[in-house]
Amino acid sequence: MRKIYIIIVAVLSICIWLLLTNNPKQIPRASTSIKEKLAAVKDYKYYLDKGNNTIGKEMQKMDLVIVEPIEMQQQYIEAAQEQGALIYGYINAMEADKWNETLYNQLQEDDFYKDEYGKKMYFDEWDSYLMDMTSAHYQDLLLEEIQKQIVDKGLDGVFLDTVGNIDSFLPPEEQVKQNQAMLTFIKKIKQHYNGLSVAQNWGFQTLANYTAPYIDFIMWENFSYDVVGEDDWSLEKIAQLEHIREKFGTQVMTIGFSNETQSRALAEKHHFKFFYNPAGSYYNSWH
């Protein structure tokens, strides 16, 4: 009797397996990961102003859109996500913009970066100040901003702008401190917000030496052939980013400001994502 029971159970198990195998709809499938979706991106946009019905429809055609969540209306964000677009929200990491009064008015004096003479660094073009990422108070403010602007609005990830300021504007000894603090901050984002996807703008050495294991894509602005096509430093960075992508899956999103055809061809040669923005580093116009 026991043998008959075992045979019946085995036959039933095989029948159930065959039914499931021949009916794919019955088989639960793992959702595509953020990294896989980013690797498959064909069309993306970086846009930091308000939306309208026309822009909202264009967003739905994109694989990835980076928006200013303070400006972009929630209805357009959600509609684009429903069509499969990834939406990342802009957060200015190493600068404080005076236009963002709600955040700016919460800053303390120790949150601002100061040089050896105690002088702040002001960027006239953007009406912003360089910040000190080693400030625990400043990190807490940014985490609150990410909660309010990214997590609460259901965005797919956070895009940290101005990370490259560390390499570009600070002396070597200060770079180490700020890079270590940036790494700590990004780890906090991951811990606080259930592994939220994080991207960064510029900061190639920061990426290579510190943040790569936690960054899903890096942006390279002015990836224009006349700037990078035959430049030794740029070619070295291209190779470095390819190595990082192979090791960590970090995608490279490039933006060309000139020479669209050649710039796009160079990006595609290295399997970088590309879009053309003749307005340069101003992203307040969709076209």
Segments the model singles out, each with a brief description of its role:
Residues 15, 21-287:
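Glycan-processing catalytic domains of CAZymes
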Residues 7-18:
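Hydrophobic membrane-insertion alpha-helices, especially the h-region
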Residues 6-7, 36:
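Alpha-helical interaction segments
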